[in-house]
Amino acid sequence: MQDSIINDKIAHAYIFTGPRGTGKTSTAKIFARALNCLNPQNGISCGECENCKNFNQSPDIIELDAASNNSVDDIRNIVDSVNIAPTNSKYKIYIIDEVHMLSTSAFNALLKTLEEPPEYVIFILATTEAHKIPITILSRCQRYDFKHISVDVIKDRLKELADIEHMEVEDKALRFIAKTADGSLRDALSLLDQCEAFSIGEALTYDKTLDILGAVDTDVFSNMLRAVISENTVECMKLLEEMISYGRDLSQFVVDFTWYLRNMLLLKTSDDADEIIDMSSERLEALK
């Protein structure tokens, strides 16, 4: 995208697709800012010109959340405004989030504009479910796929923010938060804020992080494993019913139980399991 700005090879429609929390909408805004920057540096906005400073208030940047504005009338309003030239920018940019939520009629209304857009109009569509978008729309967009962010990258970013905020956080706690976020930096930041709120004035330890985030006690997993090994169906059902009564999401319980089994395998096969297993010292000893 930087190269397209440098070489002035700008498409009229882009689609950013990938899992939630991976930066699609944020990237769309960063890209839009760079497109209308008066003095871009290597394809990146300068942050100093009038267009950069007034980006959030610019009438030439139009955002639409298709999750709640998905009717044909919503899109027709956009189509009607397309013919009005930008006020003080090079491009008039439409950012449509969760675009897969648009109705069939809304997609049809959008299609004609995508086929013959004015030179100054750019559409940036963001979605978590590209397969739900009509091929007629996809074929007219330059596509970028966003992937889950690695645990290490998320952890490093959390560490940077913790240092800026002068938070004392154990490295293992940050790694657990990063893993729990499941590739979503946005979710990781939310979890870190949650942990910070419950540990004001105290160091955020790994054990405290487990308590705050409500990690299931390993005794439950241990009892479940014993019941499975002994083929005790009654005990398995009893444990599952207890999880339901506590309001536990069983699909998440399965994920956590799988992680527990992974930790057990690591204990049996790795000499440095203590460093890579996401478990408190007390629980780790119990697992051994």
What are the residue ranges of the model-derived segments?
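P-loop/Walker A NTP-binding region and its immediately flanking N-terminal helices
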Residues: 1-143, 153, 161
